[in-house]
């Protein structure tokens, strides 16, 4: 017997056009984007589908990702695609909570909007940095 789990990505997986084919095909997806806009005041559809720099700003990326993930999840649920588990990487954990029924989409929009704002404020543009350490030994990692 096969089991299915949904894994939701975190920030960094966003790209212009994400979710567009679902948005164009399903009324329910458009409703998710409308709800996100009502809760946050952000035109999430424009954010996702039009070329812009805002999609790469934490303050906006997070609501765009969460909305897209939950809208697609809804389509999968409506199609009767069963799943036994949901998990997420960082931001994706919120979509996983929604998939599990622990967080409503509307409440999630509220939380994610604030999360994005606070994270953006914590590290203003041009300050701070991040590095990925790949294929180093433990000793080399300690030296870094």
Across the structure, where does each feature detected by a protein language model lie?
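Hydrophobic side chains within alpha-helical segments
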Residues: 65, 72, 93-96, 110, ...
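Alpha/beta catalytic cores of group-transfer enzymes, especially the acyltransferase/condensing modules
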Residues: 11-13, 38-40, 100-144
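Helix-rich "cap/lid" substructures immediately adjacent to catalytic or cofactor-binding pockets
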Residues: 2-87, 136
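Gly/Ala-rich beta-loop-alpha elbow adjacent to hydrolase catalytic centers
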Residues: 69, 84, 88-92, 96, ...
């Amino acid at each position: 017997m096969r089991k299915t789990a949904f894994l939701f990505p975190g920030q960094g997986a966003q790209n212009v056009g994400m979710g567009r084919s679902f948005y164009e095909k399903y009324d329910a997806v458009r409703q998710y984007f409308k709800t996100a806009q009502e809760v946050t005041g952000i035109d999430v559809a424009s954010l996702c589908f039009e070329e812009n720099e805002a999609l790469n700003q934490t303050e906006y990326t997070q609501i765009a990702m969460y909305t897209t993930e939950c809208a697609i999840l809804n389509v999968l649920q409506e199609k009767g695609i069963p799943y036994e588990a949901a998990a997420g990487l960082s931001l994706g954990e919120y979509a996983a909570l929604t998939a599990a029924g622990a967080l409503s989409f509307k409440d999630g929009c509220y939380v994610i909007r604030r999360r994005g704002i606070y994270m953006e404020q914590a590290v203003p543009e041009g300050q701070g940095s991040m590095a990925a350490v790949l294929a180093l030994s433990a000793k080399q990692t300690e030296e870094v």
